């Protein structure tokens, strides 16, 4: 949604003293200018916003006739780009205790630590997001600036009731994780302005009992397989890295358009110590020389990289400890701790799609290109590791890429089924589950 926002004009509310806004959000871009998730406006003196500020704190604001009726900001920050947050704003101005009139929940838990608070007076009915003829926007400020960069899902609004979190999610009895409820049933009713959009896809058609559809204001609304119930890895914007973060885009799955003359490394989110993981890297561009390494793609042991990297970045030191494996564009595969590496892997060029299958149960990494596994590799071979590169040690391993020049441009596909904005077609056959990939293991 980096340039995308949605619009709607509200109708006459069922009850403007009570409402609930619930949504799931996964951030892509962090620690930059204020980014609006929700905006409402009657005029310059009657406004509403729910946004992350430049320091990644969450704030809510409502003004009536130029005076704040709601204003608060969290002390906590929201910088986990691997996570889906369920954020719920519940308003009931009929409550006698002012702190009960506005409640904010994150993943089912009420927020109570705020840098400042302004609560509405009792029975205040000037709530702009649920006011007749308010111009509503999801994903941007009213003038299409301060656009939100990330993913949203299950955006629900209940008019007339301040709901509890259990309407929208529940705690997993085994893991303790807050998980989504894919069937939302308000305790009373949706109310006149109630809606439910972005349910299991990019549809702007209201899937509540109403017909309060939304309209695409600008940009392209892309469906992702990454969702609150099935999270996929991305490049880790929150990690220590020398990558120019401004060049990252498309949900942190694209890295390019940089111009330094030094190595820039970025690890993935969702590092693991066990299990089997598959992902793809498309080489969108390579620096002109065919005799010099300017790209390395593979895996990094996140804990070891942090412990051993004195520059506070993820650029792997290839002459020291063994905490990374990189497939170089001209000279084969290198295990950190070995400068020479292994040359019996093919080179790669622009337009190639690299395949990575990481088997952490057997400490094997399989490398492939354009649908064929290198060294006749067989990712299903288990402990025998047919054609695999041996992962040197157990650890917390994640996908990893390094590039050197501005023309070294790459895209990852960890299951969303896109390289940048281009959908994969045809997808691997049979269809990959979960996720959509160019090739099938």
For each predicted feature, which ranges?
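Short hydrophobic/aromatic patches on beta-strands that form ligand-binding or substrate-lining surfaces
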Residues: 21-29, 87-89, 138, 152-156, ...
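Extracellular glycan-recognition modules
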Residues: 3-61, 96-98, 161-166, 270-274, ...
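Extracellular glycan-interaction patches encoded by glycine-rich segments
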Residues: 126-152, 403-404
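Low-complexity, glycine/proline/serine-rich flexible segments
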Residues: 1-17, 54-60, 64-68, 132-135, ...
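Extended recognition patches within non-cytosolic domains
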Residues: 1-5, 96-98, 115-117, 151-212, ...
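Short surface loop/edge beta-strand patches of beta-sandwich-type extracellular domains
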Residues: 1-19, 69-79, 141-144, 180-188, ...
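Extracellular glycan-interaction surfaces
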Residues: 1-3, 22-30, 49-124, 341-344, ...
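Glycine-aromatic-enriched beta-strand/loop faces of beta-sandwich-type recognition domains
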Residues: 296-353
């Amino acid at each position: 949604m980096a340039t995308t926002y949605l619009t709607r004009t509200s109708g006459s509310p069922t009850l403007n003293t009570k409402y609930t806004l619930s949504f799931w959000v996964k951030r892509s871009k962090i620690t930059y200018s204020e980014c609006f998730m929700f905006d409402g406006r009657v005029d310059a003196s009657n406004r509403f916003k729910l946004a992350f500020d430049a320091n990644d704190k969450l704030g809510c604001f409502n003004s009536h006739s130029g005076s704040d009726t709601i204003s608060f900001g969290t002390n906590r920050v929201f910088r986990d780009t691997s996570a889906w947050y369920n954020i719920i704003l519940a308003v009931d101005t009929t409550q006698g205790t002012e702190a009960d009139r506005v409640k904010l929940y994150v993943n089912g838990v009420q927020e109570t630590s705020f840098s400042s608070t302004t609560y509405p007076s009792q029975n205040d009915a000037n709530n702009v997001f649920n006011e007749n003829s308010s111009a509503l926007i999801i994903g941007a400020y009213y003038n299409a600036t301060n656009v939100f960069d990330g993913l949203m899902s299950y955006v629900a609004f209940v008019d007339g009731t301040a709901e509890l979190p259990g309407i929208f999610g529940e705690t997993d009895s085994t893991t303790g994780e807050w998980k989504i409820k894919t069937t939302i049933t308000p305790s009373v009713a949706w109310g006149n302005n109630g809606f439910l959009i972005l349910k299991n896809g990019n549809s702007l058609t209201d899937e509540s009992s109403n017909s309060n559809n939304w309209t695409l204001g600008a940009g392209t609304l892309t469906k992702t397989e990454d969702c609150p119930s099935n999270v996929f890895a991305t490049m880790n914007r929150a990690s220590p890295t020398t990558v120019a973060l401004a060049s990252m885009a498309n949900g942190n799955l694209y890295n390019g358009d940089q111009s330094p003359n030094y190595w820039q490394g970025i690890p993935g989110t969702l590092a693991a110590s066990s299990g089997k993981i598959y992902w793809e890297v498309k080489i969108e561009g390579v620096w002109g020389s065919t005799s010099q390494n300017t790209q390395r793609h593979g895996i990094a042991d996140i804990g070891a990289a942090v412990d051993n990297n004195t520059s506070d970045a993820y650029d792997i030191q290839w002459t020291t400890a063994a905490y990374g494996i990189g497939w170089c564009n001209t000279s084969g595969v290198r295990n950190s701790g070995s400068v020479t590496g292994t040359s019996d892997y093919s080179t790669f060029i622009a337009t190639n799609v690299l395949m990575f299958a990481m088997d952490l149960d057997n400490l094997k990494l399989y490398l492939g290109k354009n649908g064929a596994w290198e060294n006749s590799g067989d990712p299903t071979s288990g402990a025998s590791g047919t054609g695999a590169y041996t992962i040197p040690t157990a650890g917390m391993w994640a996908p990893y890429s390094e590039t050197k020049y501005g023309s070294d441009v790459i895209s990852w596909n960890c299951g969303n089924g896109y390289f940048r904005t281009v959908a994969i077609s045809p997808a691997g056959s049979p269809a990959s589950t979960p996720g959509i990939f160019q090739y099938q293991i």
